């Protein structure tokens, strides 16, 4: 019985990670099916959303000043709810800008769209690396 109880967190973590991968793959296939364009920036946009959610949950940037002090006083559960709402909205704005940049490639050779989204992925990943660094990040966990 102890073996099953010790194994349960690993099963839950594995299932949640598998569902996350399935969500990313479904989004990727939806973009390919609807737009007929291979969007290589899809994973980078997902990573950007994760980092933006991290900022909403625990803002640790000095430029926030007094707002950061006030914001950290909010309950952690409320900050998680705000992250679920704000991070996808912010990434949607970035995705809209990317879509406007991709419009000239519609109806042309698919290589143009492929190169554009590959370049966008490199730019987004480098922006993440410049702003947050390449070290692992920590988050507060609600109790």
Pin down the residues of each PLM region:
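Small-residue-rich transmembrane alpha-helical segments that form helix-helix packing/gating elements
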Residues: 1-35, 40-143
């Amino acid at each position: 019985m102890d073996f099953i109880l010790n194994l349960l967190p690993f099963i839950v973590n594995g299932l949640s990670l598998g569902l996350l991968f399935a969500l990313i793959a479904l989004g990727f296939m939806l973009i390919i099916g609807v737009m007929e364009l291979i969007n290589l920036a899809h994973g980078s946009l997902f990573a950007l959303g994760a980092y933006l959610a991290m900022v909403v949950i625990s803002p640790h940037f000095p430029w926030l000043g007094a707002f950061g002090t006030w914001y950290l006083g909010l309950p952690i559960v409320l900050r998680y709810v705000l992250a679920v709402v704000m991070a996808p909205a912010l990434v949607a704005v970035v995705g809209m800008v990317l879509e406007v940049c991709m419009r000239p490639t519609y109806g042309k050779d698919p290589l143009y769209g492929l190169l554009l989204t590959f370049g966008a992925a490199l730019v987004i990943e480098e922006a993440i690396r410049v702003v947050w660094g390449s070290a692992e990040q920590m988050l507060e966990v609600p109790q």
